[in-house]
Amino acid sequence: MKGYEVNFDGLVGPTHHYAGLSFGNEASTKNCNNLSNPKLAAKQGLLKMKALADMGMKQGVLAPHERPHVPMLRRLGFTGDDISVVAQAMRYSPELLSSLSSASPMWTANAATVSPSADSQDERVHFTAANLNNKFHRSIEAETTSQVLQAIFKNERHFVHHEALPQVALFGDEGAANHNRLGGDYAKRGVQVFVYGQQHLNNGLPGPKRYPARQTREASEAIARLHRLDESHTVFVQQNPDVIDQGVFHNDVIAVSNQQVSFHHQHAFLNQDQAFAEIRQKMASIGEDFISIEVPENRVTVDDAVATYLFNSQILTRPDGGMTIVVPEESRQNAAVWSYLNDMIQMGTPIDAIQVYDLRESMRNGGGPACLRLRVALNETELNAVNPKVLMNDQLFMTLNQWVDKHYRDRLAQEDLADPHLLMESRMAFDELTKILGLGSVYPFQK
């Protein structure tokens, strides 16, 4: 049976703003308090989705989350009607309201970890929503993420949904941003590579000193158990703590994979040679080669990789069998990075084409092309069981652009977050969106 990789991109929400909430993410910190343009951000994301669909890729849409997150404000003691709750929060702490108004669910690489049916002992696709324990503004996402995923992947014969891991540092989980799957055809067995930043139950191991390691080995191992993965086709690799301290807050800022190919920096992993030997051996056991494209420090520094999000790219297999790397405009603007990319596509590797997209609104908040998408490998039967209303086509692209034009602002500052009109505008937009995407009542205000 034929297999597909379906990319589900997050639609940017109407409260997209620059709050500098993500310590360890240098772009997020640098652009704190800048004016944002939610309408442009959403349209930039939609353009990428449509362009990839037009290339023949399977492309889906994940809905934004309700923000401001009034239920959490109520848990924190703010009372009255919803507009009063938001106003009180603004008076008490603009920073708290900003945190609970973040449009961070757009970065769906952190939404969940997904294991395809070919790898799972029960032959079903498994989803575990990420607890995103390391950052308060993201730790509130798991419940809505789970409900959105369940509305898209409903059929229990094909799909299994697990609760997020416990909300403690020991099980800090950042989802697919620290997870790669290598293999051949998307419908056949692969090798899953879980990347972690620290191991809580073994304090003797090296770890970062400046920035937090957001993913733990304990979390990755728990997900592998939940997803019923075979140990002989699963690898756990530690990210190099030195690059975490240089701003590589997720593995997808320093490495990306597709099928047999791993595209990564020279300093991406701790004990890199040993890790790749294990991956190579496990790939051989499923009859596949492991192709390592390693970018040396003397061609692209870690600092340049972080600044341009070279590795926060997408590698996509086209219908003709070749691979295209999708990079942000910032990669083209950096001479060293652009020179390397153009040399790479002449090297005879499977990657033979480059596509550049302007995602500046997301990039300024610290998220590139790979941050915006959740990869789901499906066979034909499973793809036919997906909610068809979320799959990108000409009609959905036009409808969502009109929806954005109708509901989104083109300028948003932090002080606008307490505007009662913004709350009501957003809720009206989300009510309409759930009908467009056929999601049902997934938002707290709809219940």
UniProtKB/Swiss-Prot annotation:
Top EC class, one word? hydrolase
Alphabetically sorted, this entry's keywords are: Arginine metabolism, Hydrolase
Q: Which Gene3D superfamilies match?
A: Succinylarginine dihydrolase
The reply on keyword Hydrolase is yes
Q: Which GO terms describe its biological process?
A: arginine catabolic process to glutamate; arginine catabolic process to succinate
Q: Which residues form the active site?
A: 174, 250, 371
Question: Where along the sequence do coiled-coil regions lie?
Answer: none
Q: Which pathway, metabolic or otherwise, does it act in? A: Amino-acid degradation; L-arginine degradation via AST pathway; L-glutamate and succinate from L-arginine: step 2/5
Q: Where is the signal peptide?
A: none
Return the EC number.
Answer: 3.5.3.23
The record's function comment reads: Catalyzes the hydrolysis of N(2)-succinylarginine into N(2)-succinylornithine, ammonia and CO(2).
Family membership noted in the UniProt record:
Belongs to the succinylarginine dihydrolase family.
**UniProt name for this protein:** N-succinylarginine dihydrolase
This protein's species is Acinetobacter baumannii (strain SDF)
Q: Top-down, what is the taxonomic lineage of the species of origin?
A: Bacteria, Pseudomonadati, Pseudomonadota, Gammaproteobacteria, Moraxellales
